[in-house]
């Protein structure tokens, strides 16, 4: 620590010299000595340096012993073992003495080194202090003299300024005199202010007394009103027992805190009213977030002396507000329910007479759809008693034809396509299931179309649609030739596809099948679908349950009305072209042959679905439903109405062979070669009758029948 003091002294001397302008004469040699000694002192002042020195000594001594064989290990070890064997205590004592000697010698060296350094430093420090004592007093004296001289000069300077500026001093005195009355005025104001707070305290006490009196009067009035309000609240509580209890507990806490504040603060009543307005509009499900009262208020509040009718009043007001809000909400919910029920009733009424649905996909629930379907099925069952009697006959005849076909199939060419048809049916099932899962994806796109479509459907009357459909059915009953009807439909479908309007054809065919359910031909369709094509059951159930079907129906309702008028004209032209000699021969081929052809059409549509986008898939599946449903229905109708029962047995055998020749290869070739067109290719309709290889088979097939 002596080194530190020496450093401190040196620093003080240098600072003194530097701080003063005078310089002390010193030799440069002494400065160099100081730097060397300071370096040594600073290095060895820390114990780490000494530890390093000791470590170096030990290591290098060991190196010297090993390198130069300074110790005779054998003799040393042998003598030590002999000593251990003879007198172990002596050996221990000798070792301890030797070690202590070494330790004492080492410490003595250290103390000598440190003491010698300290002595040198002390001598240098004493010299420095002596020089400082000699040097410093004259500097201090000079400072004192300078300060005294400066002080003397300053008053001398002030004296002439007084002589010169006497006028200014007079002016200052005048200003001071003016300021004195102002100060007196300020003193008076301060006194008045002191008196005013006293008056304020008095007025506050008076106001508190008045507010207490007012509160007591109000409480008396409120106690009377409370009895009337209790009667009202009991009625309200009977309705809302479950909702109110939680908020009321918290309200009681709020009102208790408010009543405590009223006794303390003069603005308590205002706070009370604000709290009522803030916390009063509590909804039944929500619990109000009540901020805890501040601890300072709690400490300052005395215990409530008055009874708490304010609490009751607050509870009643809040309960009344809750009752009103809840009744309003209930009334709004009931109105919304009534409106939704009215809308569903209106939609039901519109669907039954005109079948132009206006509902959006998602407003009406599935339960309402199920109810409408049940009503429509009841109407259909009433109107469809006569055709239902005719259906079992058609079923039996179709079964006979199906059994006779494998018996009379003589050629392998006709058998192979029938097997492929069966495979195609299986593929169709899988595709229909896959498409039904994918229908939910573009529902949003269809919703946009429904909004525009609904506006058009509301403008157009449902009566027009029903009258047009009646005309269609009359024309279709007249048509007995199956290939001609296929030509008509094929031509219509292809023309619509080429004009980039696939929707009209779908609507034409779906209108009689789905929307105009109450009319007599449709019950046949429903009942014949079940025995003839069991494949269609899962499809229809999946389609009816979804809102996408509504979208398609709405689009169809608009486009059919646009394309209704040209349709009968086309059919009339096709009827004129039909040869009359073949009419009586083919009514029954419809019952079995038609499903095959329609299945081929379905294969076309399903393969086109893969290339076209997802919305096209929905429309094509709708086509399949309708074509399967309508064509067998028409065929069975025509077969039972136009042809007498005596000719049926003879014609069955001829029809089986002719239908095999006509239809089974047609369906095969349609599957294979009509993939790439899909309405984008040819301008003219590509139907089975127009293929060059198969056109020869069609005129030949009716030949033997004539």
From Swiss-Prot:
Residues 1-47 are cytoplasmic. Residues 117-127 have a biased composition (Acidic residues). Residues 8-24 have a biased composition (Polar residues). Detected in skeletal muscle and in heart (at protein level). Detected in skeletal muscle and in heart. Residues 69-706 are lumenal. It is a single-pass type II membrane protein. Phosphorylated by CaMK2. N-glycosylated. Glycans are attached at residues 75, 625. Signal peptide: none annotated. One of its GO terms (cellular component) is plasma membrane. It is found in: Sarcoplasmic reticulum membrane. Residues 1-28, 117-265, 281-663, 684-706 are annotated as: Disordered. Its main location: membrane. The chain crosses the membrane at residues 48-68. Pfam families: Asp-B-Hydro_N. InterPro entries: Asp-B-hydro/Triadin_dom (IPR007943), Triadin (IPR010798). Keywords: Disulfide bond, Glycoprotein, Membrane, Phosphoprotein, Sarcoplasmic reticulum, Transmembrane, Transmembrane helix. Residues 128-254, 309-358, 372-432, 443-518, 525-552, 570-588, 599-621, 628-651 have a biased composition (Basic and acidic residues). PANTHER family: TRIADIN. Contributes to the regulation of lumenal Ca2+ release via the sarcoplasmic reticulum calcium release channels RYR1 and RYR2, a key step in triggering skeletal and heart muscle contraction. Required for normal organization of the triad junction, where T-tubules and the sarcoplasmic reticulum terminal cisternae are in close contact. Required for normal skeletal muscle strength. Plays a role in excitation-contraction coupling in the heart and in regulating the rate of heart beats. Interacts with CASQ2. Homooligomer of variable subunit number; disulfide-linked. Interacts with CASQ1 and RYR1 in skeletal muscle. This is Triadin. It comes from Oryctolagus cuniculus (Rabbit).
